[in-house]
Amino acid sequence: MEQLPVNVVGWLESLKKQVNDGRKYGVVSHPDSRSLSRSGDVVVKLETAQWNQTAPYNQMLPIIKGQRAYTGCTITAGAIVMRYHKWPNQGTGTIPGYTTSALNLERPAIEWGHTYEWAKMPLVYKTNGYTEEEGKQVARLMLDLGTMIKADYDSGGTGASAYYLATELPVYMGYDKSALYRDRYEYSDAEWQELMKNEIHQRRPVIYSGFNENSGHAFVLDGYTTDSFFSVNWGWGGYCNGYFLLNALVPSGSGAGGNNDHYNFYHSAVTGLMPDQGGDYIESIRL
């Protein structure tokens, strides 16, 4: 074990913990039992938007093979956190345009001739239960975020890295510079859980990412219990939301961009997301 790279060691330890937790809580591999019942009392539960990746969220995105592109899970997770803070009123600077990787789509730059009217972005968009303006407001936010982190729109889904939410939100959206992208393998399980709990306790929902053998997914942690179960907002319009152990992130189904699998590998998180408090950039290196 000592000769293995630290990230591999961290991954193996995470798998070991996942197996042990499964035995402890009686997890079985039946599809009806893929998510655990919540254990412990709720310590903090933040109210976050139950948003998704399709209409109305994607109505300003490019049409690919006759259909609007998905917003992308990373963009949806970022938008959910921004809606929680209701910040900013307007972006700053000019978000540069770019060319997507998969399809070479030319995406135009974003100029700030618009503001965000958070009161017109409801926490839940029910089918035929929102106004045209409410649809436009959330779609505008998704478009801006996608351009900001250079979303790679494709017919099968939209790719983007949560790393760029940490670096670009302070630049264009007035978020604190202390926002940081963190890899789980750099921390012990206890340290990582305490870090996530502290963020939520400080009223900062966490953008969290996990992978399986085929793909990854970004979502939001917005609560936790005394037994270290975390409330997960999967970014699927409320579908599959619930409490999960961080070593057993196995939703009972899948929404837009998902693949009906677990997300237990290669965890990372964006912490410190909050309106500008005068903080400074933090080096993402732990000694």
Predicted regions: what they are:
Residues 151-167, 171-182:
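Beta-propeller domains
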Residues 73, 145, 169, 208, ...:
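Generic structural hydrophobic/aromatic packing signal, biased to beta-strands
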Residues 69, 74-81, 161, 165-169, ...:
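Stable alpha-helical elements in mature extracytoplasmic
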Residues 1-49, 201, 214-215, 225-287:
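Cys-His-centered catalytic/binding microenvironment captured across papain-like cysteine peptidases
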Residues 171-233:
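Active-site-adjacent substructure of cysteine-protease-like catalytic cores
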Residues 1-158, 225:
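Active-site-adjacent structural segments surrounding the nucleophilic cysteine of cysteine proteases
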